């Protein structure tokens, strides 16, 4: 499959967000701690923890910091107080939004998420209001320059659902949620270590945004991601390259 990267715009926006390194690390440490608490502190035996460690290393977190977070999860009851929640709603112009949070205070998190939607011209919806528009999938991304044919062969042999070659030469490998870990590890064993590997929510349909709407939607997404309890924000926004260039 070929085409322009529908998800590239989100990656560009995430690069801006990643500048807030301290906040990103806080979220990663929380995921490491909870993953270790729930599935044990040995990454080889805990797929969720293994993925969390990979993401932390990709973000340039030191191994010492990672090990301390894992040790905290195994040896502390703090992670037991954490619950994982999701919220659904609409950004301006009806763009669908899903927010995933990890919190020890449901009321605080709900109030903060609701405030962000309200302040940015969106609406917090009920459970199921937009979830039907998304499918949870694994996504493994490779920068331009990778051997396209060899990667495609390896991905399909490993059980990938789809391989998308983007206009800029980057490649995204998509998997079912259940097969994500096995496909990612099979690709790594074949010499294809993704620049980014994550479980994400892929929309079945997208909303193409103009500059004004994109600014409003990204303002909401940025505000949501600034919340300490929020781990991930997904949308069905598709921002064309020319609009993204104007956003800077």
Curated annotation (Swiss-Prot):
<dbReference type="GO" id="GO:0071281">
    <property type="term" value="P:cellular response to iron ion"/>
</dbReference>
<dbReference type="InterPro" id="IPR026564">
    <property type="entry name" value="Transcrip_reg_TACO1-like_dom3"/>
</dbReference>
<protein>
    <recommendedName>
        <fullName>Transcriptional regulatory protein PmpR</fullName>
    </recommendedName>
</protein>
<dbReference type="GO" id="GO:0006355">
    <property type="term" value="P:regulation of DNA-templated transcription"/>
</dbReference>
<dbReference type="InterPro" id="IPR048300">
    <property type="entry name" value="TACO1_YebC-like_2nd/3rd_dom"/>
</dbReference>
<dbReference type="InterPro" id="IPR029072">
    <property type="entry name" value="YebC-like"/>
</dbReference>
<keyword id="KW-0963">Cytoplasm</keyword>
<keyword id="KW-0804">Transcription</keyword>
<comment type="function">
    <text>Involved in regulation of the quinolone signal (PQS) system and of pyocyanine production. Negatively regulates the quorum-sensing response regulator pqsR of the PQS system by binding to its promoter region.</text>
</comment>
<dbReference type="GO" id="GO:0005829">
    <property type="term" value="C:cytosol"/>
</dbReference>
<dbReference type="InterPro" id="IPR002876">
    <property type="entry name" value="Transcrip_reg_TACO1-like"/>
</dbReference>
<dbReference type="GO" id="GO:0003677">
    <property type="term" value="F:DNA binding"/>
</dbReference>
<dbReference type="InterPro" id="IPR049083">
    <property type="entry name" value="TACO1_YebC_N"/>
</dbReference>
<keyword id="KW-0805">Transcription regulation</keyword>
<dbReference type="Pfam" id="PF20772">
    <property type="entry name" value="TACO1_YebC_N"/>
</dbReference>
<dbReference type="InterPro" id="IPR017856">
    <property type="entry name" value="Integrase-like_N"/>
</dbReference>
<keyword id="KW-0238">DNA-binding</keyword>
<comment type="similarity">
    <text>Belongs to the TACO1 family.</text>
</comment>
<dbReference type="Pfam" id="PF01709">
    <property type="entry name" value="Transcrip_reg"/>
</dbReference>
């Amino acid at each position: 499959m070929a085409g322009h990267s529908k998800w590239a715009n989100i990656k560009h926006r995430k690069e801006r967000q990643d500048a807030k390194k301290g906040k990103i690390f806080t979220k990663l440490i929380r995921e490491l701690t909870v993953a270790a608490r729930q599935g044990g502190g040995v990454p080889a035996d805990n797929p969720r923890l293994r993925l969390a460690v990979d993401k932390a290393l990709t973000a340039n977190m030191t191994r010492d910091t990672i090990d301390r977070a894992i040790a905290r999860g195994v040896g502390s009851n703090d992670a037991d107080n954490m619950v994982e929640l999701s919220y659904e709603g609409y950004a301006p112009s009806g763009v669908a939004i899903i927010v995933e949070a990890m919190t020890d205070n449901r009321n605080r998190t709900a109030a903060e998420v609701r405030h962000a939607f309200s302040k940015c011209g969106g609406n917090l919806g009920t459970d199921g209001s937009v979830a039907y528009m998304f499918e949870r999938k694994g996504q493994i991304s490779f920068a331009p320059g990778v051997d396209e044919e060899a990667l495609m062969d390896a991905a399909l042999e490993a059980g990938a659902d789809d391989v998308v070659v983007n206009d800029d030469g980057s490649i995204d490998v998509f998997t079912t949620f259940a097969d994500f870990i096995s496909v990612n590890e099979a690709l790594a064993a074949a010499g294809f270590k993704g620049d980014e590997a994550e479980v994400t929510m892929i929309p079945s349909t997208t909303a193409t945004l103009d500059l004004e709407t994109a600014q409003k939607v990204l303002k909401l997404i940025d505000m949501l991601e600034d919340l300490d309890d929020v781990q991930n924000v997904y949308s069905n926004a598709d921002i064309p390259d020319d609009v993204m260039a104007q956003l800077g």
